Amino acid sequence: MLDLFKAIGLGLVVLLPLANPLTTVALFLGLAGNMSSAERNRQSLMASVYVFAIMMVAYYAGQLVMDTFGISIPGLRIAGGLIVAFIGFRMLFPQQKAIDSPEAKSKSEELEDEPSANIAFVPLAMPSTAGPGTIAMIISSASTVRQSSTFADWVLMVAPPLIFFLVAVILWGSLRSSGAIMRLVGKGGIEAISRLMGFLLVCMGVQFIINGILEIIKTYH
């Protein structure tokens, strides 16, 4: 049992800095400013479920999926970087509000009646939390621990789902507490956070792409 706790602790130490729930909370604050409390709670729960599912698939079938489709880790990083940068541009340069006219008001009311956009999978779960770095770490760790004799076989079977579940729970708790932050900073603060996070996401996306290109150069050099 002690080995199980050691494995879980080691997994959390490795994954939490990569998953970085606080970054996801800041992104959530920028994207969910106009959502109702119930919708924010629903998106928080869905994002946590998606993160758990992505990590489980990455651990048990990640390498198989990547080999089947011929996807490399550098390719995963570059693709994730493009997604992150695109999301960042949209946050940094949001669409301008329509001119105040009867037609614009009518259209605005129609849009308000429509369901809010689903942000749980993209970008909250992927690539913000379970991004290229997290997935790459899980896939590489999966192949490493299966060849290792540090832990018993039953620990290697039980620990990964528990680690991923705890990461998802930590993310869910962090996102649920974002409501208090929203009330504290107000709408203007949310817009400022959104622009700032947009800029940071563009930087992160570009860095993902650079890292992927550098890995390609090292591989084929």
From Swiss-Prot:
It is found in: Cell inner membrane. Belongs to the UPF0056 (MarC) family. It is a multi-pass membrane protein. GO terms for cellular component: plasma membrane. Residues 29-44, 90-118, 176-196 are cytoplasmic. This is UPF0056 inner membrane protein MarC. Residues 1-7, 66-68, 140-154, 218-221 are periplasmic. Keywords: Cell inner membrane, Cell membrane, Membrane, Transmembrane, Transmembrane helix. The keyword Nucleus does not apply. The chain crosses the membrane at residues 8-28, 45-65, 69-89, 119-139, 155-175, 197-217. InterPro entries: Multi_antbiot-R_MarC.
